[in-house]
From Swiss-Prot:
GO cellular component, one term: excinuclease repair complex
Record localization: Cytoplasm
GO molecular function: DNA binding; excinuclease ABC activity
Residue ranges annotated for the GIY-YIG domain, each copy included: 20-106
Domain of life, source organism: Bacteria
Keywords recorded for this protein, A-Z: Cytoplasm, DNA damage, DNA excision, DNA repair, Excision nuclease, SOS response
Taxon lineage: Bacteria, Pseudomonadati, Campylobacterota, Epsilonproteobacteria, Campylobacterales
Name of the gene this protein is made from: uvrC
The protein, known as: UvrABC system protein C
């Protein structure tokens, strides 16, 4: 009996003896890679819903989607684990999906914890600060959650109001540089009363709650900076204005009050608009849009959405909503809703999930499926927003089709929805740095960009150092579907060796300039680049959409790496100039901690510099 026949026989024996109790099941392939984790009230019935037995061979059921049928065809081992009840199965399923990240489970793996602005009113001179956790004090006032713009909002408060700029300022006995530039009222020297400072705090709260008033202040400041030819500062202010303007916290629900989190999941079929190359594949792929509205005191303070690429037939609605809610509420949230609103549909495990969330959040929140009234209107509002996201996402389907085409061209195991791109930059072996950019869901995710100071001299060793450091962080920052390198065959083999050493399943591609007469040549608009995979080389035409897409990623990481290289070089030049003025390394660091940049330091008077250097070090608390 061959190994394949033996595996099939063992699987048949196992199927005949499956338990009928509740629990979780796991599917593994011939390399013992976990494919899927699921829960079931009756394990035997659920597992057999995937499989048929024909001529003593296991085949996928006819009603399965192509993607799930492909998964079933890869199953060589099934593992089950019994639980006392369905609720325990639900807990265990979610835990295993989060920790093991099975290939075919829905991609709700990114842990999103939204920031809040808070103020501790038990302090005589409180400060506005950011948190993502519940703080242990009943004197804390929270504002949020903010899906984006929280940092810009906070910075705007400190730039425009005389607030205590650092925690250490209150404990000091002498006014610091912030008081000299009129940004701190100097409570350390009793130059402001608690009552007067409380009025400033009230102004800050008013600006948080009235973005229009804050934006008027910022726009006036931007125009003043521009008029004074301070264009860099004006550009920073412009970006801040744009970020705060985008914060979706202006809408009011006039017909109701209360605290609600609204979740609406909507399917989108992406297969209809695909390129011819995609039509050749027999998989009908879909995108789910998970739309979320966060409502506090009847006000929509923020909203967000997640694009979930998967096959609609592989998960039913209860599974999808269960995973979405467990993922969202798995960490403590400062301002919990009274109710979670989801659309009406048959949800047998609703009470189990509600009880689990109550235990998880230590609250009495309810999951409600409203059929009519104001709460139903909130669901319709979320649905309307999801439709708009669908419209925008449909416009981006060319990128999706390009990803599918790249997958098929390079024979990748999955569509590379998440891509990390790497490049190094140096000048004659000095200021050696590397950059990693991240592309997900049709966009560059700048919050996930990473810069690396490299300590090796040649480009090959620098790439090795950077990739190894990234791979060693997979536990805290999960790997993408694809690595794209600026290089060739040597870089691909290097990356594959590193990935193998950490046991990560990541595809690797490389793109490099074609060489003419031993020199890399690339003319604008006529780029001669070679794309390489593990086993093949592709010389695509300059107008090929796949090549242009990968070039866009390569150019972005090149820009990011060289910008960091120039920054390091300029910083060293400025540091050398300061050293030439007989300041020590420690003094330069101390000055930069206070002034924030060399540019600000240049404009400081000698008296201000001497004042900073004469102060004893105090660490923030």
């Amino acid at each position: 009996m061959s190994n394949k026949e033996s595996t099939s026989y063992n699987l048949l024996v196992h199927l005949a003896d499956l338990p009928t109790q509740s629990g979780i099941y796991q599917f593994f392939d011939n390399e013992d890679t976990l494919l899927y984790v699921g829960k079931a009230k009756n394990l035997k019935n659920r597992i057999k819903s995937y499989l048929s037995i024909e001529n003593k061979h296991i085949v996928p059921k006819n009603n399965l989607s192509p993607r799930i049928a492909l998964m079933v065809s890869q199953i060589t081992r099934i593992h089950t684990l019994l639980t006392n009840n369905e609720q325990d199965a639900l807990i265990l399923e979610n835990s295993l999906i989060k920790s093991l990240k099975p290939k075919y489970n829905i991609l709700l793996r990114d842990d999103k914890t939204y920031p809040y602005i808070y103020i501790d009113k038990s302090l005589p001179y409180p400060r506005f600060e950011l948190t993502r956790q519940v703080l242990k004090s009943n004197q804390i006032q929270y504002f949020g959650p903010f899906v984006s713009g929280a940092r810009e909002l906070l910075d705007s408060l400190y730039d425009n109001l005389p607030l205590v700029q650092k925690k250490s300022c209150v404990k000091g006995k002498k006014a610091c540089i912030f008081h000299q530039i009129h940004k701190c009222p100097a409570p350390c020297e009793n130059k402001v009363s608690i009552q007067t400072y409380a009025q400033t705090i009230a102004q800050g709260i008013a600006l948080i709650e009235d973005k229009k008033a804050l934006l008027k202040i910022l726009e006036s400041k931007m125009h003043t900076l521009s008029h004074n030819l301070q264009f860099e500062e004006a550009a920073i202010m412009r970006d801040r204005i744009q970020k705060i303007t985008q914060m979706k916290n202006q809408s009011i629900i006039d017909m109701m009050s209360g605290d609600y989190d609204v979740f609406v999941l909507q399917e989108q079929d992406c297969g209809k608009n695909s390129q011819d190359s995609h039509k050749k594949s027999h998989t009908a792929l879909h995108t789910h849009i998970l739309m979320m509205l966060f409502i506090r005191n009847g006000r929509i303070i923020s909203s967000d959405f997640i694009l979930l690429h998967d096959d609609i037939q592989s998960h039913n609605l209860p599974q999808l909503y269960t995973q979405a809610l467990l993922n969202h509420y798995k960490t403590q949230i400062p301002l919990l809703p009274q109710e979670i609103l989801i659309p009406p549909f048959d949800f047998p495990d609703l009470l189990h999930l509600q009880q689990l969330l109550r235990e998880q959040t230590r609250s009495s929140l309810k999951i409600v499926q409203p059929q009519r009234g104001a709460k139903k209107d909130l669901l319709q509002l979320a649905h309307k927003n999801a439709l708009e996201i669908r419209r925008l996402h449909t416009q981006q389907n060319n990128t999706f089709s390009t990803l599918v085409s790249i997958k098929e061209l390079c024979v990748l195991s999955q569509i590379p929805y998440s891509i990390e791109v790497f490049d190094t930059s140096h000048h004659s072996g000095t200021h050696n740095v590397g950059g990693m950019i991240v592309y997900e869901n049709d966009d560059f995710i700048r919050s996930k960009y990473r810069r690396y100071e490299l300590h090796t001299s040649d480009e090959y060793s620098q790439m090795h150092e950077m990739l190894l450091r990234r791979a060693q962080s997979f536990d805290s920052n999960p790997p993408p579907a694809l690595w794209l390198l600026d290089g060739g065959r040597a870089q691909i083999n290097l990356a594959l060796d590193i990935l193998k050493s950490v046991g990560a399943n990541v595809e690797v591609l490389a793109i490099a300039k074609m060489k003419h007469n031993a020199k890399a040549y690339r003319a604008k608009g006529n780029a001669f680049d070679i794309l390489r995979s593990k086993n093949a080389e592709f010389k695509l035409k300059p107008n090929d959409k796949r090549l242009q897409f990968l070039q866009k990623l390569r150019d972005e990481v090149h820009r990011y790496a060289i910008t960091y290289h120039r920054y390091k070089k300029q910083k060293d030049i400025q540091k050398a100039q300061m050293m030439g003025k007989n300041y020590t390394q420690a003094q330069i660091k101390k000055l930069l901690d206070y002034f924030g940049s060399f540019e600000s330091l240049k404009t400081a008077s000698q008296e201000q510099i001497n004042s900073v250097l004469s102060r004893r070090n105090r660490s923030d608390t």
